[in-house]
Amino acid sequence: MPGVRGSGYWIGGSILVLIVAITLHQELSGPSELPRMAKDLQTLREDFRQLNKSCFILGASGETGKELLKQILQSRLFSKVTIVGRRKLDFEDEAYKDVNQEVVDFEKLDEYSSAFQGHDVGFCCLGTTKAKSGEAGFIRVDHDYVLKSAQLAKAGGCQHFNLESSKGANKGSSFLYLRVKGEVEAEVEELGFERFTIFRPAVLMVDRKESRPSEWFARKMLSPISYLFPTAYSVPITTLVRAMLNSAVLQSDKRVELLENKAIHTLGKMEEQEQKS
């Protein structure tokens, strides 16, 4: 039936055009300029090192946390680096020999308040999935553990708290994942850190050791789209981590910063942009 087939092609083509239009809109919309800086990034990093700041990382065993720890040590931005987790991690590389490890029971965090004392900057990369931990377990990790850790960090003197959240986070969302992410963002903000930075990455482009079929499928589907529209629906994990570190040295005067996926790309690629200019 030519007419039916033609209608199918027309509908399929229309859907494809709509997807491309939406993607292009997301690619082009929103701020894309680099932050205005009185100094170049390398100078800002040198100035930051002179401050002898200390930091802690929550979730250093996860993909973002592992990459973050690696880049922090390579950059030598902090004079002291502590990872806080439920178990001690084994490192073979000599570069990790000075990393401090605080092993805590997240169900009894009040008993481990000392682990959160004396840090200038905190990075929270804690997270699990409903598929892995169940609904209650997901809420406990992504909300309860994160919020309690932030409370202890604030009490311990942390000035700048960085939270890895998710694209689409919204405390009013009907989707559990996005609602919980939005709720914890709002509740951590209420703690009143001197500086609170929220990172909302889209799909992270990374090959996880942990099996997450839905993320694997999403990465495969998004790979060609990411090539054409790199900032719309995904972000390489290395770019996210570089954005976290670049954000720290930029010393923004904003108390609360919300960085969506496109802003993460911009911040994470500052070195490349400086080299081109």
State each model region's role.
Residues 40-77:
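N-terminal Rossmann NAD(P)H-binding glycine-rich loop of SDR-like oxidoreductase domains
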Residues 87, 132-190, 194-199:
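Conserved Rossmann-fold NAD(P)-dependent oxidoreductase catalytic core, especially the SDR/UDP-sugar
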Residues 1-47:
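N-terminal membrane-anchoring alpha-helices
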